[in-house]
Amino acid sequence: MRCLFLNTDEQIKEQIKTTFDLLTKVQNKKTIAYVDGLYSLKCGYESLQDFDNAIKYASEIIELINSGSVQYDDKYKQHMSDVLVSCYDTKARQGDFESFCIAMEWNRPIEKQFYLPRARLLKKHGVIQGVQDLIDDKLDLLVLNLPPRIGKSTIGLFLQALLGGMYPDESILAAGHTTGLIDSFYDEIINLITDDEYRYNKIFPNNKIVDKSSEYHFIDLNKKKRFHTYTYISIETGGTGKVQAERLLYCDDLVKDVEQANNPERLEKLYHNYTGTVKDRKIQRLCKDGVYRACPEIHINTPWSLYDVTSRVVANAKSEGNMDRVRIISIPCYDEHGESNFMYDYGKGFDKAYYRDMEVAEDPVIFSAKYLMTPVERDGLVFNRDNVCYYNELPADEPDKVVAYADVTHGGDFYSTLMTQDLLYKRYRCHITSHNAPTNKAKRDRILACQDDIRGIATERNTYRVYFKQPDKIKGNKQYQLAMKNLFGWNQNIAAQNKQHDDFPDSLAGMITNVLGGNKKVGTARSINAEKFGL
C-alpha cells in the first residue's frame, strides 16, 4: 500500500489537522477505522518529509496490529497486512534496521526467512541494538564475535543493503579474507537489491543498479561514480586509489583459518594491508549529532588470535582509553548453563547436542576460537589432547591415598580450619594442615616446572603418574570439561599471561609440588572415605 498525496503542503497539513481532530474523538481505538486514520497521518507526515512524526505513527500502528488489539474479519486481512508492511517500509527508509529486515522478507514464508526466526536471540545477545547504534552514528567500531553459521555475515549484508539504499551517493567499502569470499558478498548484495523474493524496490523504489563489475567487485546505484556505492576487496591484496569508505567500512573474516592465524608473519602482513590499504580509505562525514567523524567500522569476526587484525584493532581502541564509542559483542555457543546460545525459532540454529558433538570432533584450540570466542595461540601451548594420559576405569585396588588440593586466594589457614572441623565432625581420621606455597616463582614458571608430571611422563624424581578421565567419560560434566579446556588452552607466551584462565594448570602444579612431590611441610590425608566426595 503506497501513500499518494497530490495536494500542496498546506493542503496536506490541513488534512492532517482534520484527521487528528477526528481521531481525538474516537472512543474505540481498536478498530480498522482508527488504524486507517493513523495511517493517513503517517502518510501525510511522510509526504511533508516530517519523518519523526511519520515514524511515530508508523510505530503506533505496528504496536496496535502486532499486539492483536485490533479486531477485524478475514476479508480485511490483506488490507491490514498492506498497512503493516507500509509502516515497516517507512521506518526502514529512515534507518531502522529491524524494520528493514522484516520489510525485505515480508513475502517470504516464515521458514525461509532469515531475520524473524533469529530475531529473539539476536536481540537478546545485543546484536541488533549494536547494529542499530552503528547506523545511528553512536559507535565508531562494532565487533561481532560469533560462532560459524549463525547468520553473522547475513546481518552484515542486510546492513550494507540498508545503508546503500539510504545513501546511494556515498561509498561502502567491504573487505574479506579472499577473493572467493568477496565474490559471495558481491553476488548476494545484487541478489538482495534485484531479486523479487525481497522487497528492496518497494522500500527504495528510486534506487537502480546502473553499473557493476564482477571482475572489479563494485556496484553503483543511480549514477556511475568514481567511488562506488559498494566496493569489495580482499584483505590479502588490499585496496587501490579507486576505493573509499564514506558511509561504512565493513570487515568480515579477515583471517581465513587457523593455519593463517598460527603464522605471525602472515598476521603481520594482513594487519599492514588493513592499515595501509583498507582503514586509510576512510573519510570523514557529518554524523547525526552534528560532529564530523571518520566513517564507522564493523568487524564480523572469528577471534582466532590475540594478534589478528580485529584483536589488534580492539587492543588499539582500549589503549586509547575511550571505549564509549566502541562495542564488542562476543557470544560463545554455550550459555552459562551449558545450553546453546543459538537455538533459533522455526527449527533454525543449532542445539546443545550439535555443539557438544563439534567440541568432541574439533581440535580444542580451533573449537575454542570458533565457538567459544577465546583467542588461543597455538604457538606457546604446552598441553593438548594428545600429550596427556587418560584412564577409562580406576584400578580395582584400594588407593594408597586420596588427596585434595585447593589454591585459595586469601590464604589457607581459615579454609583448612573449616575443612578439618567438618571432617572431624563426620568421624574421619585425617591430618590436614595449611602451608604457603612457594612464591619465589611466577605462576608461569611453576606450571612449566611441572609440565612433565602433568603430562603423565614417568621421571626419576617422581613415584606417581597423572591421568585424566577419557574425554568421552566427562560428557555432561561441565566442571571437568571446563578444567580440561583451561588446561589445553594454557599458553606459556609472556603476552598471554593475565589474559587466560589458568586456575586448573596452576592447581595441578600446586598439588604436584606441595602434595605429590613430597613437600614434607604439607600434610597428607591418611584415611578418607572417597565415596562421600563422589570420587
Describe each PLM feature range.
Residues 338-406:
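ATPase catalytic-site recognition across NTP-hydrolyzing enzymes
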Residues 139-159:
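Walker A/P-loop
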Residues 414-535:
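C-terminal nuclease/phosphodiesterase catalytic domains that cleave nucleic-acid phosphodiester bonds
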Residues 175-236:
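Conserved nucleotide-state-sensing and coupling region of NTP-binding domains
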